[in-house]
Regions:
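N-lobe entry segment of adenylate-forming
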Residues: 388-478, 482-497, 602-606, 993-1012
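AMP-binding/adenylate-forming catalytic core of the ANL superfamily
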Residues: 515, 540, 711, 823-827, ...
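Conserved AMP-binding/adenylation subdomain of ANL enzymes
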Residues: 634-651, 659-709
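Conserved pre-ATP/AMP-binding loop-to-beta segment of ANL
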Residues: 575, 582-622, 629, 643-651
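Conserved AMP-binding/adenylate-forming
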Residues: 476, 491-536, 657, 882, ...
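Conserved C-terminal "lid"/linker of ANL adenylate-forming enzymes
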Residues: 903-908, 918-920, 933-1012
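Gly/Ser/Thr-rich phosphate-binding loop
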Residues: 673, 700-701, 708-713, 722-799
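Alpha/beta-hydrolase-fold enzymes
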Residues: 2-16, 141, 154-271
Length: 1012
């Protein structure tokens, strides 16, 4: 005979004994049958099904006007029944009764779904977007996306994803989230470096993979959820026990009890868990941007629809400050908040949610539909306040790396022991220094025959992290494995075209992934990449750097055929059959599978002492070349990675040309060897050599879309950031660091003032030799820092500015320059280490030594920090001796409020055999020149021979593609009286201010110079 449930106990039974009997009866019934009674869920139908989800429509066809479409998304770990737990606690029923049209995304139980435990984070986000498409198609309405906990995070991501993949309306009417954190780092203890958290998460991922290789089972997710709030879990059990005698009370809580007890929990797919922990927790991508969904780089900054976020005052899983991270993450959206006196679960289930949450949501929908007012409980959300004494990772890195660099290259082998004894490191410093030691040690151990190259670095990353993102371009993400395969295919194409080891191959390309791919492919093949400048006449470049083959992009190829005089190889822009025209060979048309590898080919065989690439230097008719050995490239790459403490969680933004040293060696190199992501500037964002500025809207769009936290620069490239108005997304920017070389002191000073929490890492690298200096801390604005451990040994020799030669002792050996005085920077030549020899000076400080002149005049302060005084080529050869131009430029740009940029140079006047100091200025936005203040500042700060006698005020300065000022054209224009487009002033004797210079004043100027 089938068992039947016992009848309800007699209501008249009372007293202590009756309560005890009722408690026993109810307890036995729950134990035997799993619950007090079965209930029917709210009516619904499955209207669509995807690879990773089913779409439920609740209360279908029950009224003519279905109302606003609300699509509810559950979190991982919990089933879709979270939205319909019990008749008295049903979100879908409450929404329907409030006039909405409820739909639910059902991810199912991953442990029972085919491939369910293999799902990734992006699988769920794409599923939400597909469900939104289905709802829009069925209703003809935009969708209100609603999500609980991680389901809300999915909604944020899906909305941003829809903005990225379509130029049309994303179709999201609003976003409503419940306990959905955005700023995951808000939960970290103060002072704990996020790098350590990333490492911990990486290790935990390995542990999870070994214990639960297929993901976290449902019982473990339930236990984990309870452990997040153990007090709440215990309280719920006590409440349940206390109510065992009250059947009516038990029935009201029955659905919730069964849901939380076992039925509501599902497995957490392993890949999705690892994605969430790495992208959302360790790298904080919801706040910073740059999470990758279906190959697209996404940022919440693209969201424009209104957002309503519910927070719980006792929510220990998603505290309000973590939820409020949506304000800086989505600055274009209007964000609102409802704060409840509830915990995490109580936001969506239970009496509190039925009294407040769902009625408020219904009122919100009415307001969004234009049929009501903004709900009274809904308040504008304020951005989370900065935490006091919040020590960022970069603060720790700054301190730690400063100590590491101070200890120097010679101590690398024993650094951990020495550092712990001398400094102590207080724990956190240890963790920021030690990860850099293998990089610095690798440089220190490198010898001439050490295998190292760009291609080898890519191969290492492709093996270590094949699915990791290598570079981001035009909104798409490309993995190391995909890039490595692309390089191999290009190599086969080059071999088919006759390129061999050791040959010099010109690369004539704009800044794009194909330019990087071509350079790495030539490195893999063993050829030398000659990186040509697209805006410099090709014939002039080939005259100083002859090539055996020329490789160009489709835009540059046609114009290169005539000056090159032979067939030009074209790479990039492939996909369709195309006719490029005469003299052009389409490498994209070559089938790599049909190319046989020759016996001599050995991939990634480059050694430290070999030339890996050649850069074009100079401008106009003063072009030169810079031979970069593989060691020199490695020094810049590993030096950047170490000084900036780069890792897989970082995104480096490259807006420098890839044919410039900063682009290919600092940005590409640093990202490549560290595993950081390389974000390449959208073409129109990259600075123009003529305009000298960046498109700020696109720049900030790229920064948010890619989650950029490190921006590479060269020269005055960042001037636009400090000259323009504040951008709407600037204050919530994820940028933590600017890294590059040649930043003018004036721009650096203004940049540090405007971006107070952002550090500047300034590099100096000599054209000859392997001299590398780096200012790790950025505290001394204008300093080039200290020698990079692993680089060449450096020394400063005393220099006679007037004679233009070394100052020697009586023995004939060079005198070492005392600290505080100006000297010539020399780099020691160590052939065994694979350093470029060039034309060294021998017997400099002792018999038999060999040093290279870097051409840089420097001064070393009492702390050991180097300051660039000027380059020998820029010295002004005045009547009283040589005058450095850089200190004059620093006065003009750092001590006058109206000056933007300045270039100081030597100018020759008719009848004079020496030069006079001249300056060209640009003014800050909306600023006016003050000739009186200008003259007074120069008179007070500079001595006679250092005072510019002629000053030109221009709208812009001529610059190279690397944003360095081209002083040659300024010298050629002379006084600028015939050049037009500017004003020329001069230092007239007896005047209090600089006065305009007319053609009739030129003789007066010359006479005043002769008279001193």
């Amino acid at each position: 005979m089938a068992e039947t449930k016992p009848a309800e106990r007699n209501a008249a039974t009372g007293g202590l004994l009756g309560g005890l009997i009722a408690a026993v009866q109810n307890g036995l019934e729950i134990a035997r049958f799993g619950g007090l009674e079965e209930r029917e869920p709210s009516p619904h139908e499955i209207v669509a099904e995807g690879r990773n989800h089913r779409l439920r429509h609740y209360f279908p066809n029950q009224r003519a006007d279905a109302g606003p479409a609300a699509l509810l998304v559950p979190p991982l770990m919990l089933s879709a029944e979270i939205w319909d737990v019990a008749p008295n606690s049903s979100a879908v029923a409450a929404l329907f009764e409030g006039g909405a049209d409820p739909w639910v995304v059902d991810f199912g139980s991953p442990e029972t779904e085919e491939g369910g435990l293999d799902r990734t984070l992006e699988d769920h986000v794409v599923a939400v977007s597909e469900a939104a498409d289905s709802v829009r198609a069925a209703t003809g309405r935009d969708v209100h996306l609603m999500g609980y906990s991680q389901g809300g995070m999915f909604c944020y991501q899906a909305a941003a994803y829809r903005c990225a993949v379509s130029d049309e309306d994303p179709g999201v009417a609003s976003l409503v989230t419940f306990g959905s954190p955005v700023d995951m780092h808000r939960r970290l203890p103060l002072g704990v470096p996020t790098d350590l958290i990333a490492d911990l998460i990486d290790n935990l991922s390995r542990v999870q993979a070994s214990i639960f290789p297929n993901g976290i089972p449902s019982w473990a997710t339930r236990l984990g959820f309870q452990l997040m709030d153990p007090v709440k879990a215990v309280q719920q059990r006590i409440d349940f026990a206390m109510q065992l005698a009250d059947r009516e009370a038990l029935q009201q809580r029955e659905g919730m009890r069964r849901f939380l007890g076992s039925e509501g929990w599902v497995a957490f797919p392993g890949p999705a868990l690892q994605d969430a922990m790495k992208q959302l927790v360790a790298h904080n991508r919801l706040l910073q941007g740059g999470f990758v969904i279906d190959g697209h780089s996404i940022s919440l900054a693209s969201i424009e629809c209104p957002i309503l976020a519910f927070t719980g005052t006792t929510d220990s899983i998603a505290p309000a400050p973590t939820v409020r991270g949506i304000v800086p993450a989505a600055p274009q959206a209007d964000a609102f908040e409802v704060s409840l006196s509830a915990g995490h679960f109580g936001l969506v289930v239970g009496s509190r949610s039925m009294e407040i949450t769902w009625p408020t949501v219904c009122e919100w929908l009415e307001w969004r539909e234009g049929r009501g007012r903004l709900p009274e409980r809904v308040k504008p959300m304020a951005a989370p306040r900065d935490r006091e004494n919040d020590t960022s990772t970069l603060d720790n890195v700054t301190e730690g790396l400063s100590v590491a660099f101070d200890l120097g290259r010679d101590l690398l082998g024993n650094l951990p022991g020495i550092a712990s004894r001398q400094v102590g490191f207080l724990g956190r410093l240890t963790e920021t220094i030690f990860p850099q030691l293998p990089r610095l040690g690798r440089l220190d151990d490198m010898r001439r025959d050490t295998a190292v190259s760009m291609a080898q670095a890519l191969a290492e990353q492709a093996k270590k992290s094949p699915d990791g993102t290598f570079f981001l371009f035009e909104g798409r993400a490309h993995s190391y494995q995909a890039a490595n395969e692309r390089i191999d295919n290009i190599v086969r194409g080059l071999l088919q075209c006759g390129v061999r080891q050791g040959q010099h191959v010109g690369v004539l390309m704009d800044t794009r992934p194909s330019a990087v791919a071509a350079t790495v492919a030539l490195s893999r093949l063993g050829a030398v990449a000659v990186l040509l400048q697209p805006d410099t006449p090709l014939a002039a470049q080939l005259a100083v750097a002859p090539v055996d083959h020329l490789l160009a992009d489709p835009e540059r190829g046609p114009d290169a055929v005539e000056p090159y005089g032979s067939d030009v190889l074209v790479l990039g822009g492939g996909g369709d059959v195309r006719d490029l025209g005469p003299g052009l060979i389409d490498m994209e048309a070559i089938d790599p599978d049909q190319v046989a590898l020759p016996e001599w080919y050995e991939p990634d065989a480059g050694m430290a002492g070999e030339v890996g690439m050649i850069l074009i230097t100079g401008d106009g008719d003063q072009l030169g070349i810079n031979r970069v050995t593989n060691r020199r490239w490695a020094t810049s790459a590993y030096g950047t990675a170490s000084a900036c403490a780069l890792g897989p969680g970082d995104t480096v933004y490259c807006c420098s040309p890839t044919y410039h040293a900063t682009g290919i060696m600092v940005c590409v190199g640093g990202a490549l060897v560290s595993g950081a992501r390389l974000a390449m500037a959208t073409p129109s964002t990259a600075p123009s050599a003529e305009l000298g500025h960046v498109d700020l809207d696109r720049f900030w769009g790229d920064v948010r879309r890619y989650g950029v936290n490190v921006v590479g620069y060269s020269g005055s490239m960042l001037g636009a950031l400090v000259s323009g108005p504040e951008h709407p997304t600037e204050r919530s920017s994820p940028i933590q660091l600017f890294a590059g070389s040649g930043m003018p002191k004036g721009i650096w000073k203004r940049l540090s003032a405007r971006f107070e929490r952002t550090r500047v890492v300034e590099f100096f690298a000599s054209t000859e030799g392997n001299a590398v200096l780096v200012n790790v801390t950025g505290r001394k604005i204008g300093s080039v820092g200290r020698p990079l451990p692993g680089g060449a040994e450096l020394s400063v020799a005393a220099w006679d500015l007037d004679a233009g030669e070394l100052i020697r002792e009586e023995s004939g050996l060079a005198k070492r320059c005392p600290r505080g005085e100006i000297g010539l920077l020399l780099a020691n030549v160590d052939r065994a280490r694979g350093e470029m020899a060039g034309r060294p000076m021998r017997g400099v400080f002792e018999a038999g030594d060999a040093w290279l002149r870097t051409g840089a005049l420097v001064r070393v302060d009492k702390d050991g920090d180097y300051w660039l005084v000027d380059n020998l080529a820029n010295l002004i050869q005045g009547s009283a001796g040589a005058v450095p131009a850089l200190p004059i430029e620093n006065v003009l740009t750092t001590e006058l409020e109206f000056t933007d940029e300045a270039a100081v140079y030597g100018l020759t006047l008719p009848g004079l055999e020496y030069e006079i100091p001249a300056a060209a200025l640009t003014l800050r936005s909306n600023a006016k020149l003050d000739p009186l203040a200008l003259r007074r500042k120069i008179q007070n700060r500079l001595v006679g021979p250092h005072r510019p006698l002629v000053i030109r005020v221009l709208s812009r300065l001529p610059k190279t593609a690397g944003q360095r000022v081209r002083k040659g054209p300024l010298r050629e224009e002379g006084l600028g009286l015939e050049a037009g487009g500017g004003e020329t002033l001069w230092w007239a004797p007896g005047e209090e201010a600089y006065v305009p210079l007319s053609p009739g004043d030129v003789e007066k100027l010359i006479e005043s110079v002769r008279n001193g």
